[in-house]
């Protein structure tokens, strides 16, 4: 009987140590959606870096739903992850999820989109304001000042949409562009197509379009082609599909981000935090214009 108790105790101790080790080595990335190639690239970059550094990485998809995002973070705190990388569905709505992680003493790193509330150790993103301005300057350089333009906006409430729009409006004012319309299409290709169809009907003299991501830009391409018009379209992100569209001449340009680098940096920063290092509050990732 004593031997049996010893064996059970040893097994329980071994199990406890295994769970503790697993928790110690586990971090997570929560993405707003995996139905977008940009965030798939971000996931791939995080997974590659986690493998290099020896971490078990949990990947969760919030499906563009703040309630799903909150549920994901709650699940991760219960599972005992040591750090959470989060790409918010919405900069305000994510605050509840971040505060939940804060209460559980789990460090949070935001990727691409910021959070308006809650304690975030570090934010990693492109300079979206600069990128929006780069897009406007590109249009002015190619089409000319006073060009008639339309903007397709991303998801309202996200820092990326707000900041890209802010940068684009700087160029609109600086370069005297004539903004005919600016309407959300939620970073979605199908919505980009539908919104662009309506805007083309209302603004047949449009000369250029700035879409706040490549998915909306590609939707706009289809709408313009179907209408038999020639309109210059500039996207944002530098996704594989976006870059191919530039090479084919369907997009005039894309403001290229490096989502894989953003994901990898997130894991790097988590590693530094968990090893007692200090990190910068904001970490910018360079942008560049890719054009034909």
Give the predicted meaning of each segment.
Residues 3-4, 21-292:
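A residue-level marker of the well-folded mature domains of exported/periplasmic proteins
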Residues 1-23:
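Gram-negative bacterial Sec-dependent N-terminal signal peptides
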């Amino acid at each position: 009987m004593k031997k049996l108790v010893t064996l059970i105790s040893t097994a329980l101790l071994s199990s406890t140590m295994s769970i503790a080790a697993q928790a110690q080595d586990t971090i997570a990335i929560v993405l707003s959606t995996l139905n977008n190639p940009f965030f798939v690239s971000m996931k791939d970059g995080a997974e590659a870096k986690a493998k290099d550094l020896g971490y078990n990485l949990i990947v969760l998809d919030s499906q563009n739903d703040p309630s799903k995002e909150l549920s994901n973070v709650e699940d991760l705190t219960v599972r005992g992850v040591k750090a959470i990388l989060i790409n918010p569905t919405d900069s305000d709505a994510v605050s509840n999820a971040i505060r939940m992680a804060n209460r559980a003493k789990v460090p949070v790193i935001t990727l691409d989109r910021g959070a308006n509330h809650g304690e975030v150790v570090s934010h990693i993103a492109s300079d979206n304001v600069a990128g929006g301005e780069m897009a406007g300057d590109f249009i002015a350089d190619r089409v000319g000042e006073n060009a008639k333009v339309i903007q397709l906006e991303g998801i309202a409430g996200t820092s990326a949409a707000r900041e890209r729009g802010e940068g684009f409006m700087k160029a609109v004012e600086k370069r005297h562009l004539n903004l005919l319309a600016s309407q959300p299409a939620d970073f979605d290709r199908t919505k980009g197509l539908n919104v662009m169809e309506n805007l083309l009907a209302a603004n047949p003299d449009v000369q250029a379009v700035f879409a706040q991501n490549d998915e909306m830009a590609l939707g706009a391409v289809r709408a313009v082609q179907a209408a038999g018009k020639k309109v210059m379209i500039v996207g944002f992100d530098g996704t594989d599909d976006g870059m191919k569209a530039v090479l084919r001449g369907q997009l005039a340009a894309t403001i290229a981000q490096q989502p894989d680098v953003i994901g990898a940096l997130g894991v790097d920063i988590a590693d530094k935090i968990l090893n007692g290092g200090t990190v910068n509050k904001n970490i910018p990732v360079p942008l560049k214009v890719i054009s034909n």
